[in-house]
Amino acid sequence: MVRLPPLDELAERWLVIAPMLLKATRRTGCYEPIDLLKGAMSGRYGIWVCESEAGIDAAVVTEIVDYPRKRILEMMFVGGGNMALWLPEAIRVFDEHASSAGCAHIACLGRRGWARAWGGAATGDVVVVRGLGDVQR
C-alpha cells in the first residue's frame, strides 16, 4: 500500500522512516531527513509510505512546484527497499495524485536507474553541480 499518512502518524513512525531517507538526502548534502519532516509539518512536502505486511518498506518525499507556466510533482527523495513490491502501485498512486493536483507531469532528479524503473520515462537535461572554487582550467 502506498499512502500519505496523517502528520501525527508520520511523527510517530519517524524513527523508522528517517533512516530510509538518510542515504538519499546525503547524496545532495542539501537536506537531512529532519528538514523533510519539518517541511511536511508545514505542508510543503508530502512524505509517503510504501507498506507491506512486514511494515514500511520505503518512503517517498514529494513536492508540488508551481512554475510560471506549469505545475509539476517533484519526487524529491526515495529511500527503503523491496521496490518490486511497491513500485507499480506507487506509479499509479503518484500519477493520480499529480493529476488531481493539476500537475502537468512528474519529475525527479536521481540516478539513471530511476528512468528504467519508472518504466519508459524519458530523461531530460543533465544536472551539472560544481562546488565554488572547483574550476579546473
Task: Give the ranges of each region predicted by the language model.
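Generic structural motif
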Residues: 1-5, 60, 120-121
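Conserved donor-binding loop and adjoining core beta-sheet/short helix segment
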Residues: 42-84
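Active-site rim helix/loop that mediates acceptor-substrate recognition in acyltransferases
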Residues: 26-47
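Long, low-complexity, intrinsically disordered polar/charged segments
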Residues: 22-23, 27-30, 68-77, 129-136
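Acyl-donor binding region in acyl/amide transferases
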Residues: 68-119
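Active-site/acyl-donor-binding loops of N-acyltransferases
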Residues: 108-137
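Intrinsically disordered, low-complexity terminal regulatory regions
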Residues: 2, 19, 38-40, 75
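Short amphipathic alpha-helix that is part of the acyltransferase structural core
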Residues: 1-31
